[in-house]
Regions:
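Conserved beta-loop-beta/alpha segment of the NTase-like Rossmann-fold superfamily
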Residues: 1-77, 124-131
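Short coil/turn connectors at secondary-structure junctions
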Residues: 18-21, 51-55, 67-68, 85-86, ...
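A residue-level structural signature of the nucleotidyltransferase/glycosyltransferase Rossmann-like core
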Residues: 23, 89, 108, 115-116, ...
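Flexible, glycine/proline-enriched loop segments at strand-loop-helix junctions
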Residues: 29-36, 85-91, 109-114, 153-154
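A short, charged helix-loop
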Residues: 74-110, 144-145
Length: 258
């Protein structure tokens, strides 16, 4: 169903516990280093969410012109309360290389970390204004939840929608916290490889494995012994019921749906 319906459904559950509740949305495949800085960024986001009845997102200072991430342009003159919170000018999709370089050179673009903080009431107001179809379904689900009835038939009718496209890019009451913690999206095997410390020939072995005459390989195999001979830039992942073998040059994140 994509992010908007899922976030809205969770907000309904939070609202039931506390109508004035604040919710956070955190992607599961992100690496965050610097827990105290991360904690402070969340505190700052909560402050703005309450003070301005606003939607808050997190932006990370780019370290290179990545084409794998979306970007957020912020208004440098609009800092709120000296807590690294800025008004959002625009969202930008994953750019081509030249555009990514221009983003970096401008100094007012951040990587979009996909982390969101807001009051559930603010979220529902935004959905009501900018996503009327989803809002109608959410209202029906709210009624079912109040009656402790199943809402699965309504859920099936909801069209997949992204919270970014459906709401964040349309609303004006949105701020970005300029994060100071280290961040990495582990959404590709190259990102996972970059995270680990390298051994001889820049190979990484976690679990049972061996590499001979090969460089920059990644083996994650807790139980099965895996050997790589004469091959470079390979990823081998062993689990109880499956084995994945893929080139690091490939950015494919999934194997077919069948």
């Amino acid at each position: 169903k994509n992010t908007a319906p899922a976030i809205a459904l969770m907000a309904l559950h939070i609202e039931k516990i506390n109508p004035k509740g604040i919710m956070g949305v955190f992607p599961a495949d992100h690496l965050i280093v610097g827990h105290k800085k991360f904690q402070q960024a969340i505190i700052n986001a909560i402050h703005l969410a309450k003070k301005d009845d606003a939607l808050i997102t997190m932006g990370v200072q780019p370290t290179f012109p990545s084409t794998a991430y979306g970007y957020i342009q912020f208004d440098e003159k609009s800092e709120e309360d000296h807590i690294d919170g800025y008004g959002v000018v625009t969202f930008a999709e994953k750019p081509h290389q030249d555009l990514a370089k221009r983003f970096i050179e401008s100094g007012d673009f951040l990587w979009n970390a996909g982390i969101f903080i807001w009051q559930v009431s603010t979220l529902f107001s935004g959905i009501e204004k900018h996503m009327p179809d989803l809002n109608e379904h959410i209202e029906n689900i709210r009624e079912r939840l109040n009656k402790k009835e199943s809402f699965h038939d309504i859920w099936k009718q909801i069209s997949p929608e992204s919270i970014d496209y459906g709401l964040l890019e349309k609303t004006k009451n949105i701020f970005v916290i300029k994060a100071k913690f280290d961040w990495n999206d582990l959404g590709s095997w190259n990102a996972v490889y970059d995270y680990f410390m390298k051994a001889k020939d820049e190979n990484i072995i976690r679990g049972k494995g061996y590499v001979q005459s090969g460089q920059q390989n990644l083996i994650l195999s807790p139980d099965k012994f895996t050997a790589i001979i004469g091959v470079d830039n390979l990823v081998v992942i062993n689990t109880d019921d499956a084995t994945l073998v893929v080139s690091k040059r490939s950015e494919e994140r999934r194997v077919g749906k069948e």
